[in-house]
A protein has these predicted regions:
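N-terminal catalytic or cofactor-binding beta/alpha core of small enzyme domains
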Residues: 1-209
């Protein structure tokens, strides 16, 4: 079944009709870290992305979550596409972060097992794909022109200090499996953190990847 078009084309439009604390909430943990983990479609919009983002951040990285609060609401009702996502707290956090990773959920469809890793930060993207595969998780790099590639310059993941970021699209079946197995969730998050740490070391040293 085709996904319905988003009800709102910006957070500004959403805020005019929806009530914070009833329909949605914004949760942010700003830390002295160059890394921001964001989940702009969290809560009941794309289930489990909030928990996955929290586990990746692990009290170390800055964390942002925009959460839909009503389980009866449909995906399109509170989903603002990443190119149009203009919630001010998210904008500010991302603009002040050197490394940005956005956590999203996608439908299983033709590839129910692979995390799709996109975004314009191709070096970090590739490190995350490799790290997930090493730990036994299926992952593929998404490239410009492919669906859910996160390759638009306006995508919120690409609006950080370096104007590049990573977008992680996790299929529903994988999200459900991670929620059902705390150790597997920790392992998944740890693989991503390890890739971020490796990338951060190279970035601070000025070496080429």
């Amino acid at each position: 079944m085709a996904r319905l078009p988003d009800r709102y084309n910006s957070f500004s439009a959403l805020r005019e009709r929806e009530t914070e604390g009833v329909d949605y909430r914004v949760r942010v943990e700003s830390r002295s870290s160059p890394v921001a983990i964001i989940a702009p479609h969290a809560g009941f919009i794309e289930p489990a992305t909030s928990e996955i983002a929290l586990t990746i951040a692990n009290g170390r990285f800055s964390l942002y979550r925009f959460e839909g609060l009503d389980p009866a609401r449909l995906h399109h009702e509170l989903h603002v596409t990443s190119e149009n996502f203009d919630e001010p707290i998210a904008n500010d956090l991302v603009a002040n972060s050197a490394i940005v990773i956005a956590i999203h959920g996608r439908a299983d469809r033709e590839d129910p097992e692979s995390s799709w890793v996109g975004g314009l930060d191709t070096s970090l993207r590739n490190l995350i794909v490799e790290a997930l595969r090493r730990d036994g998780f299926a992952a593929v790099a998404r490239k410009k022109g492919e669906a859910l590639a996160g390759a638009s310059a306006g995508n919120i993941c690409n609006r950080g200090q370096r104007q590049v970021g990573v977008q992680l699209e996790i299929p529903r079946g994988v999200r459900d499996a991670l929620m059902a197995d705390a150790e597997k969730l920790k392992q998944y998050a740890s693989a991503i953190r390890g890739a971020i740490d490796e990338f951060g070391r190279v970035l601070s040293s000025g070496e080429d990847l």
